[in-house]
């Protein structure tokens, strides 16, 4: 059985040894993995840590504002938000292949950190990498943005959670006193909404994806399912379908809903979701997002599918 207190003590000591009094930054996303890593690093080295949140433009609706409120205003972290939307979206123009998207995002992600590190005199990068990240990368299922680092990286990497699984990280979050909204927040992919937009990432599809995911989260979080599901989200498919808006034929985008249950993300299954809830989400998406004509439901387990679409 995983014991949190011994791990916390050993991890703090190990972080101190690895960092060796050097100035350090951490990639903070607001998810439970990076949040736990940030708290451990803060306890290990204190004011030598700078938490950096990169707004790639591919994050959830209102994400930057929430990150600032929680981590800066409530938790008092030394936080820097880097606005990098234009950089990421420009490089992703015309890119269709999902692995190419991930590699571009991974490269830019680290380049942004290197730039901040140089400006601030940082030398070490702490990451919230957990076991499924590197296991999947070594198995060549997917390349995770915090594993396939580009050549010539100038920062040393420290990964205090590398051997843990998500359920263990959540236990750590509770033991470290993180708020429930962080400790039990659903996982969000490192590349952000890029892996929930099939085909080319355009401003139109990105806006649809943000709003559709907001609607899904809002509806699920009104129910007990928020404590039972591993992930719940919407993806924008790279296809259009015919619909009717009023008395007029409409030809527009298709959104897929995905709900999965899992313990550690290595396997996952699709549980039964109340049909009236699915219908309510579908109705909201098609009525509140004008350029969506159809909503479909993905019921595929992992394996054979992965949890995210790309």
UniProtKB/Swiss-Prot annotation:
**Which pathway is this protein assigned to?**
Purine metabolism; GMP biosynthesis; GMP from XMP (L-Gln route): step 1/1
Q: Which GO terms describe its cellular component?
A: cytosol
Cross-referenced Gene3D superfamilies: 3.30.300.10, HUPs
What is the main EC category here? ligase
Indicate the segments annotated as coiled coil, or none if absent.
none
Q: GMPS ATP-PPase domain: from which residue to which, for each copy?
A: 2-185
* Catalytic activity line of the entry: XMP + L-glutamine + ATP + H2O = GMP + L-glutamate + AMP + diphosphate + 2 H(+)
Domain of life here? Archaea
Among its keywords, does the record have Nucleotide-binding?
yes
Q: Where, by residue number, does ATP bind?
A: 29-35
Q: Which residues form the signal peptide?
A: none
Q: Which HAMAP family is this protein grouped with?
A: GMP_synthase_B
Provide the protein name. GMP synthase [glutamine-hydrolyzing] subunit B
